[in-house]
From Swiss-Prot:
One of its GO terms (biological process) is urea metabolic process. The gene is ureE. This is Urease accessory protein UreE. Keywords: Chaperone, Cytoplasm, Nickel, Nickel insertion. It comes from Helicobacter bizzozeronii. GO terms for cellular component: cytoplasm. GO terms for molecular function: nickel cation binding; unfolded protein binding. The keyword Cytoplasm applies. Involved in urease metallocenter assembly. Binds nickel. Probably functions as a nickel donor during metallocenter assembly. Belongs to the UreE family. It comes from the Bacteria. It is found in: Cytoplasm. The lineage of its organism: Bacteria, Pseudomonadati, Campylobacterota, Epsilonproteobacteria, Campylobacterales.
Amino acid sequence: MLAESVLGNLKEGGSSKELDFIDLEWFDAQKRMGRFTSQKGAELVLKLKNPPKMGLCDGDILFEDATSLIAINIIPTPTLHVYADSTAQVARLCYEVGNRHASLYYGDSPLSFKTPFERPLQVLFDKLALRYEVLKSKLDASQRISVSAPHADPLQEGSAPLKFKSALDLQIVIKK
């Protein structure tokens, strides 16, 4: 079977069709091409023409016929669940995690976040006195916090670099 686009997501509504899943690690959700075997043994070739910018999400439907669906299942992985007590802690957390180029995801409650487990981050959270716990959970691309902009491909015809305009109401405040 060939999957060239994401057909929807299981979260959008129920289906009476037989469900089958392709298990993916969170870091493989960015793939746009590959050959996978589903939990029930079906072979699927993934060749996305317009892949989602944030990657494949848990529940994304890649194949559908009259009787069955094949969707993505993001495998739970060890994660650090971090709980901030203030917006200042959120800013510090985002700065430190971003400075280490680690992935950061929204948590299940306000001011909570998830990141893949890494011992150096655990040590950092201890130093910053952030509350955290190590749990297994799904790191779903739909919950990923990203500030990355798409890069221009200089070899691709018609590709142009991003252009930024300064806002008329831009203010820079320097506190001493």
